[in-house]
Design a protein with these regions (language model features):
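Gram-negative and organellar
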Residues: 1-360
Length: 360
């Protein structure tokens, strides 16, 4: 506002205020500021693209994912996931998700299938606070068993202070990493907290805590924390140090990775060109590489690595496609000694060219 006090026709001032409102979650005020910008600067490219970004955020879309994973424990999995999201206003969104997953082991000839159905709502009852609830059912079918289990994912997201993000939630899911786990019908009740703190001098700190109570009477504590530095903003380039701690109440290594103590430390580097901000007919990408050591109970340290990549193309303001891949030998993501690999294809298509409600 001080900028506009000096020059009511300042382009940087008007669009800067629109961006500030948007970053604070005040969509209506942001739209008013960008509309004022376009009144003064007709068809200005940056302002038009900013308006497109807001409209796209509230436009119904379909997202399809196909993935294939395998590890050196002879487990393979194929998965498809379909999501339809329909914003009804700047505050309310409804969605539905269907996921099919088939897992098998080439040595034991054991296989299993799961079908997940979910319905969800999102409600933004304050510019800086939102609530999400997804409820559904998973139907599992293997060589030896068939059952249904309840799925729940619910959480609050908030921005308590500038440059800070907080998420508190509960998630109930079924262990479906491989056929043996599906056979055991283990459901997990996860209570979690995510917290990210940014700064004006490029340093950031992310922390995640999970407490998990399982239906096999086991429980888990998980702490992950990351201290990082933002080297660049376009594209985003950041790097830092990650630490992870896991502790299970009971050790059942024949069933799943469940150490009494697990510690891992790694250095990571990430580069990102965000699909949300690139213009149509542009490439986008993300790569995250990390290496370090893990310590499983009293065993000697083990070298670890992790590579995650995504590469895609935005064909238009409504359609984008990307491929992605992961390779990791970190025990906490699979099981002790495993090397996990996943490749996939993702498509996101805006069903219309604008929101289905009057965006004001």
């Amino acid at each position: 506002s001080a900028i506009l006090g000096n020059d009511a026709k300042s382009f940087d001032g008007n669009l800067g205020i629109a961006n500030a409102y948007y970053a604070s979650g005040e969509v209506t005020n942001s739209l008013g500021a960008v509309a004022k910008t376009l009144e003064i600067f007709k068809n200005q490219n940056d302002a038009e693209n900013f308006l497109k970004k807001i409209k796209s955020e509230f436009t119904p879309y379909l997202e399809e994912k196909l993935s294939y994973s395998f590890d050196n424990g002879n487990n393979t999995a194929m998965s498809t996931r379909s999501l339809i999201s329909i914003p009804l206003s700047t505050k309310w969104t409804v969605n539905t998700t269907y996921q099919y997953r088939k897992t098998e082991n080439n040595v034991t000839n054991v296989s299993a299938k799961t079908n997940d159905f979910l319905l969800g709502i999102d409600y933004k009852f304050h510019p800086k606070i939102s609530y999400t609830l997804d409820v559904g059912v998973t139907s599992a079918n293997s060589n030896t068993t068939q059952y249904n289990q309840l799925l729940i994912n619910t959480y609050f997201k908030a921005k308590p202070f500038k440059l800070q993000d907080l998420e508190i939630g509960y998630k109930r899911e079924v262990q479906n990493f491989n056929s043996d786990l599906i056979d055991k019908q283990i459901a997990t009740n996860n209570y979690y907290l995510n917290y990210n703190m940014g700064t004006n001098f490029n340093f950031g700190w992310f922390t995640q805590y999970f407490y998990t109570a399982q239906t096999d009477n086991n429980s888990r504590n998980l702490l992950f924390t990351s201290f990082y530095y933002n080297f660049m903003s376009n594209p985003v380039l950041k790097g830092g140090l990650n630490y992870q701690y896991i502790a299970f109440k009971n050790q059942v290594p024949t069933d799943y990775f469940s150490p009494k103590r697990f510690n891992a430390v790694e250095l990571f580097l990430e580069i990102l060109k965000d699909e949300k901000i690139v213009e149509a007919k542009s490439w986008f990408y993300n790569a995250n590489v990390a290496t370090g050591f893990q310590f499983i109970e009293d065993n000697s340290k083990q070298w670890t690595y992790r590579v995650q990549t995504k590469f895609g193309y935005k064909f238009s303001d409504r359609l984008l496609v990307n491929v992605y891949g992961t390779r990791s030998n970190i025990a906490s993501t699979t099981a002790a000694g495993f090397t996990f690999n996943e490749v996939g294809l993702r498509l996101k298509w805006n069903l219309f060219d604008k929101p289905i409600f009057d965006l004001k």
